[in-house]
Every structure is written in C-alpha cells, then in structure tokens.
C-alpha cells in the first residue's frame, strides 16, 4: 500500500497545490487562460504525439478496443440520462448534462499522467485512443443533444459543420493523428525538435494537474445537488466496473490496455462538463459541485483501484 500511496500522493498533491495556491493568491480567473492554452495546445499534444509515434502501427488500429471502451462510456451516459429524464422528470438538456457528469471522466488532464505513472509507457496507446475517440464522441453528442433540446438556436447544418470543425481541428486529435502518421512512416524528428517535444511533454502532467486544482478553487461548492446521489456512484464505481466487464467479455486484450481503460473510467467528472453547461446556460452550478465532489472522493476510489491492479487482485481477464 505504501507503493500506491507513493504513486497517488504526488499526483493528487499537485491538484491540492493548485487549489491551495488559488485560495491564497488573489488572481482573477482570467489569469488561468494562458496556462490552459499552453496545456491544451502545446504540452498535452506533444505528449500524445511523442507516445503514439513510438508505437507499432498494428497497435493503433484496434477498432474492437475503441468500440468497446467508448460504447461502455455511453451505456453509462444513457443510463444516467434516462434516470434524469424519466425518473426525475428533468428536461432533455438537464438530463444530458447529468449523463455527461456520470460518464465524461477527466481523461485529458488526469488520464495521461496517472496512467503513465502507474502503468508505464505501454499505457500510452490506449490512453491516446480512448481520449481521441471518446472526445470525438462527446464533441458530437453534446451539441446534437442540446440542439434537440432546443438549447441551440443554430440550424442543423450549422451545428453539424461546427461539430465536424471542432473534431477535425482539436489539438489533441490532430496530435494523435500526427503521431499515427509518424509511426506509419517510421518518422523520427530531428534531435532539436525531439528535445522540444520532450520538454513540452514533461510539462504536461504537472501543469494540467495544477491547473485543475486552480479551476476547482475558483468554483467553490455552494450546495450539494440531489443528483449527486446517483451520479457519483455511476462515475466512480459503475463506469469502471462496466468497463472491466465489457473488456473481459469483448476479447483478448493486453492486460495493460484493460487496466488503462478501467483506470480512465474511474476518473472523476471532467471539468469540460462545466464548460458545456456554461456554453448552453444549463446545470452550471450543479456541474461544478459534481466535479468537486467526484474529484475529492476519487482520491479514495482511484487509490483503491490502483491497489487492486498492482496487487494482482484484479485480473486483466475476468473470463479467461
């Protein structure tokens, strides 16, 4: 257990330092803009490119793994959406936000750093594949559902064009595809460029985690919404359990790939859920509360999951 604590403490410690710094130092929220720009447009794309470009091409074309992992995430989304819409009688827009809160994990800011730290560089490819295709799905579903709910005043063709543009030009997706192309062509960047990529990649995890802590501090918890009662268990427990079962039933996967997918599924609600709510003017305060609560509780749940993985108590294939 001491080994697991040694893995998790620096990771969540960076989030805590970001939170503490934001509470102690009086800076406006806009001051985070350039740090987030550095993370989203430079550091994390460099990390994805570096890791994917060094991977054998055959490992980058596992459509079965992609469909199973993304499909499992949307099973959780559909379940929470149905609870919100039919049992709680919320609007389509509110139920959509609840679905994202229960299924959209913080795989961008938390995923790469934690997976690589806990499972090694072999985890890089499943992290990149899950992140790339899951975010492409989120970028498609969110505006489509909000348009169906009447939360968007744009014409369907404009919505569709916006979705395609957002997916095609997202820096994470572009860097992943660039990494795939480099792997296919066996391209190695010149040494000065490779060093620059390395510097940016090394900055990705600490900057992203610190920024996440600051973001949590800037959105203080005002009240605990009732939906927390089913969203939190769905995100922190149901999602990783279903991911584990689906991959165990779905085929023969590398144990590290299974463990990576389960670990990513166990992560707390993504800060992008608040951004979506803010964009459409729905469920903003509750999204902020959900992100904060799931992040706090994930210290225990993620630590427990890592203990199961590292101790061998969680076999890679439940049905060998």
Swiss-Prot record:
<dbReference type="GO" id="GO:0005886">
    <property type="term" value="C:plasma membrane"/>
</dbReference>
<dbReference type="InterPro" id="IPR004776">
    <property type="entry name" value="Mem_transp_PIN-like"/>
</dbReference>
<dbReference type="InterPro" id="IPR038770">
    <property type="entry name" value="Na+/solute_symporter_sf"/>
</dbReference>
<feature type="transmembrane region" description="Helical">
    <location>
        <begin position="196"/>
        <end position="216"/>
    </location>
</feature>
<feature type="transmembrane region" description="Helical">
    <location>
        <begin position="32"/>
        <end position="52"/>
    </location>
</feature>
<feature type="transmembrane region" description="Helical">
    <location>
        <begin position="113"/>
        <end position="133"/>
    </location>
</feature>
<keyword id="KW-0813">Transport</keyword>
<keyword id="KW-0812">Transmembrane</keyword>
<feature type="transmembrane region" description="Helical">
    <location>
        <begin position="289"/>
        <end position="309"/>
    </location>
</feature>
<comment type="similarity">
    <text>Belongs to the auxin efflux carrier (TC 2.A.69) family.</text>
</comment>
<dbReference type="GO" id="GO:0055085">
    <property type="term" value="P:transmembrane transport"/>
</dbReference>
<keyword id="KW-1133">Transmembrane helix</keyword>
<feature type="transmembrane region" description="Helical">
    <location>
        <begin position="167"/>
        <end position="187"/>
    </location>
</feature>
<protein>
    <recommendedName>
        <fullName>Putative malonate transporter</fullName>
    </recommendedName>
</protein>
<keyword id="KW-1003">Cell membrane</keyword>
<keyword id="KW-0472">Membrane</keyword>
<feature type="transmembrane region" description="Helical">
    <location>
        <begin position="65"/>
        <end position="85"/>
    </location>
</feature>
<dbReference type="Pfam" id="PF03547">
    <property type="entry name" value="Mem_trans"/>
</dbReference>
<feature type="transmembrane region" description="Helical">
    <location>
        <begin position="256"/>
        <end position="276"/>
    </location>
</feature>
<feature type="transmembrane region" description="Helical">
    <location>
        <begin position="1"/>
        <end position="21"/>
    </location>
</feature>
